[in-house]
């Protein structure tokens, strides 16, 4: 690729030197890419506010000799998601979704499913307050796109049905555990029958199912703890945006 036009969501923007900026995009065409925006901080005339996180933009890029970074020549805003930027809770959820998307995928590997999911989740945040069920649906969808979906429909260890009662969940084992396997696994997390059923509905129905899924406490807490543990197991750490959500989460249920 010498020059190309990409459509992408800004996942991160980092200042570089006195006047430049490096942006990471999740694009529809090429997956995750990073681009060098020369002079982006010195003059707003060229890029305006288009390089802010969560912005959906159209970008003209070019390859740069001897560098893994693309050159960012021009951009235009497709969606600014202005409504979500006026609310701390929505900003926190958008930041978490962007960081999770950035960490789950490798560079230059197309991820149409994750790109579309991220745009849809930002649309939902732009339209109204954050919903715990929507964030869980985003996490599950992002894990599916990355090939890391937890096993919830049967025991992750032996494959047996888990039944209709409460179960245990273990990230290292890969998901829910039946009554026969759970006692042999230390430090498992509880999942009530209603919590497991809600997660299965969100796993199958995605963001559309989240609109009719209340996921109220204690189910919301159990679902959050299980998916947070699963993500930490695969990523090797707790995301910075997740830690921020933990600070303000009691106000959001996120």
From Swiss-Prot:
Gene Ontology cellular component annotations, sorted alphabetically: bacterial nucleoid
Signal peptide residue numbers: none
Family annotation (Pfam families): RecO_C, RecO_N
GO biological process, one term: double-strand break repair
Keyword tags: DNA damage, DNA recombination, DNA repair
Listed InterPro entries: ARFGAP/RecO (IPR037278), DNA_rep/recomb_RecO_N (IPR022572), NA-bd_OB-fold (IPR012340), RecO (IPR003717), RecO_C (IPR042242)
Top-level taxon: Bacteria
Similarity comment text for this entry: Belongs to the RecO family.
PANTHER family, A to Z: DNA REPAIR PROTEIN RECO
Function noted in UniProt: Involved in DNA repair and RecF pathway recombination.
Record's protein name: DNA repair protein RecO
Protein species of origin: Anaeromyxobacter dehalogenans (strain 2CP-1 / ATCC BAA-258)
Lineage, opening ranks: Bacteria, Pseudomonadati, Myxococcota, Myxococcia, Myxococcales
